[in-house]
Amino acid sequence: MDLRDLLSDPRPFALLRRRVPGRAEHPVEVLIGPVGSRDRLAELPDEGLALVPFRQIRERGFDVRDDGTPLLVLTPEESYEIPLDEALRRLPAHEVRVEGGGFDVGDEEYAGIVGRVLKEEIGGGEGANFVIRRTYEGEIPGFGRADALALFRRLLEGERGAYWTFVVHTGDRTLVGASPEVHVRMSGGTVVMNPISGTYRYPAEGPTPEHLLDFLADGKEIEELSMVVDEELKMMCTVGDMGGVVVGPRLKEMAHLAHTEYELRGKSSLDAREVLRETMFAATVTGSPVQNACRVIERHEVGGRGYYAGALALLGRDAGGTQTLDSPILIRTADIGADGRLRVPVGATLVRGSEPAGEVAETHAKAAGVLTALGVRPGRPRAERELPRLADDPRVRAALDGRRSALAPFWLRMQQPAAEVSGHALVVDGEDTFTAMLAHLLRATGLAVTVRRYDEPGLRAAVLAHEGPVVLGPGPGNPSDLADPKMRFLRELARTVLREHRHGVLGVCLGHELLAAELGLEIVRKEVPYQGAQTEIELFGRPETVGFYNSFTARCDEEAARELAAHGIEVSRAANGEVHAVRGPGFAGVQFHPESVLTLDGVAIVGESMGRLRGASAV
């Protein structure tokens, strides 16, 4: 079949150019067939191309504005491949014009939203980072199938480094884009995720290693990427049978910009549809922790997200009959209606160091990048020759290697359980799936682990009956806000386990703050949130490099420290009185996250803590 036949064939179609690992060439794949809707991911067929909207995250019980965007699947009746050069010859090459154009949320309004998120959400302990979207809107007069194919051709010609370049035409809606980022890939039981964060936008005169090195040394960019690696490791530890391994960092070079990225790999025995469900959706397009990020998105964004930050998902089977899944994140994508209305959603990642004006500029640059790549907005003249690969510069390689050395070695290799500690730990999840990573860390010390959410029926009784250590895990929110039912319950639970549980309790981040409050220490809001910060501290007399994700902290002065010491309780604190850790008969608490990739020796810290708790009696 000739690609030009798609102009007259009324059936839905998809054209995909995928970067398939292990293949030297990456042809254009053509899928033609009917499109139908489904309610849940579990209803997807074994083979087909799914369009997964952001609202589908409701399957995980997360808050989301339901805009009615359907979960669709194209079931191929015909499929074939075309070499790239042949596809370029046969696809329409005419110019596509966009009229009007502007953001649905103005610059001043968006800057105000950014400021509120920084102050109220990140400053209020609701999370480490959040992605807030606005949408560039315009109109393509007389839009039709030929225009969709012409836009796809422009992307094939002008973009490089994309993971998927695609056009999907459902009959009444067209998605065309070049996504740089894997949502999740599964083949032969191996699951791969690809957290990307940090963007070096090429200057008008072109990219240089010197400019790139400045970008690679930017602390804000480093923290952004580290935070999303942690967030996606949470997902990998949920779907992976033995956790995950961090590969990288690497540089992803595209036509107009470059990104820093990692790859996460793990083994999974789950069904591909379950893997897809448990990985909805990446922190790079939501925030962290993801569940609370969804609440923040619902509170601050205007309207629903449609397919933005959702995923395409190509399901199939390999020659041996094993399930396969290949899924890019739906970013850098134009969503075009049958009436020619064009929507280009873009988001900025807000972290503690963000400036509202800078994030406004970021969304302008991202929208312009998509429209330029599509050829509907003028860009810089194309270079006469291919740009040199920046990643080949020895200084760039050294800078990337330096970032890797700042990650916990535990997460850089496949892990096997040790036999340092025996028993069964019960982990209480306070709405942050850092507990999945924490459980993996605990298993690595030799413990069996069960994770239960704080709001599960019967949790309090289960905790008191548990004959092993209890871990009060992390979670968003203000630990002093007893008007919050979650905090009221967790505060009471902390009091109960300290008094009545006889097998030891460890508090992590929020759990630590709850224990500290029960010890009589003051809990205060930090002047500057400490979200995604890697710092060297003195931990009970020895130096440790650890990762913090907190907006609140316990404070302890000299007098309070002496009083606690008289009761056998040690306090590890900074010079300003902020408490890093506490430990006493039958309990311990750490403000930092030992399970984070930012804590270099977290497994040893947890192993030592559990060893001290073993057989101890609570106060």
Language-model-derived ranges and their functions:
Residues 134-223, 316-344:
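An anion-binding catalytic pocket shared by soluble metabolic enzymes
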Residues 388-422, 595-619:
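Acyltransferase
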Residues 78-100, 139, 200, 208-298, ...:
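Contiguous alpha-helical scaffold segments within structured protein domains
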Residues 489-499, 504-508, 512-604, 608, ...:
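Pocket-forming structural segment of enzyme catalytic cores
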Residues 424-425, 432-507, 614:
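Flexible gly/pro-rich beta->alpha loop and the following alpha-helix that scaffold active-site loops
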Residues 27, 43-46, 185-257, 337-381:
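Cytosolic ligand/metal-binding cores
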